[in-house]
Amino acid sequence: RARDLFISLPGLTLAIDEVSKFEMVMETARKAIYNFIRNEPSQIKIYEMEHPDILLWAVWCIQQYAKMVSREACRGKYGVLLEDIMRFLCQDKHPNLILHDNGLLYTYGTNRAVTWMNSTVNGHPVIPRTGYIVEINTLWYNALRFAGELSGEAGNNALAESLGALAEKSGKSFVNVFLNEYGYLLDYVDGNMMEWSVRPNMIFAVAFDYSPLNSSQKKGVLDIVTKELLTPKGLRSLSPKSGGYNPNYVGPQIQRDYAYHQGTAWPWLAGFYFEAYLRIYKMSGIGFIERYLIGYEDEMSSHCIGSISELFDGNPPFKGRGAISFAMNVAEILRILYLLSKYNY
């Protein structure tokens, strides 16, 4: 699946000095991206390319290459691809995204799952996230800033200025739409309908290199996530204080589908949590992260030898569930270990 691919790729390759493997996989992904952008039939079986956040995760993936290899190499290999993705999005050509005048991206998710919280029952999403979705617009702002800077470095000043202006508009709208009076971010907003449940999707606005939030706002979001979502095995998909909390991924398929994103803990989200933690606490946060990561050592010999389960129950004893090895979890743990080894914030 496309989302899993782009989130996992940096950790599974760049973080362990396998740059050539990153480039090989991205070459295949590049073909799939262009097939989608050009509305051409594709022989490449990368599923769900049409989902609204996929191209934005592809930009994030390329951004990690720029950080972990070099910006110059990134411009040379992926500069044109990056600009083509951004033009496609800015020209409002994506079939499942609408670029509104306020600079935010809107998507319809009432009747179909459109994000990583994609559990469905009888063809309907368990969590019908629709409208302005917080992580999609966080990815969007980050992509605008990163692509704008890289385009400027490549001498494409017109595109750089256009993306920068759109980022300014998007950033202001993001704060107005998502930040609530309690200091955390709404999960999604559709007109007068606001989703107040505390979910982990807000953590990306603290973790990413470019965020519309200021330092105080970032710390407020991180504090809420720490208090309500952090477990020894990852971030809960829903706060115990929110309605519908169901931390146990057990029972028949339909029962597990309802619980999938309603309180279970996901290790891959902890990778972004720790990236956010380092941005706020810098060197003083390293000890906490190192102690936390030690907790996965027992897990690697409990449910699957040498790997990490897909998800965990959200309450003690935080039992491993789902697939016995999950690429996004492994990737983000490797990426955080890399960040700790190269720490230079």
Language-model features and meaning:
Residues 1-6, 43-55, 122-138, 187-213, ...:
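Solvent-exposed loop and edge beta-strand segments that line ligand/cofactor-binding
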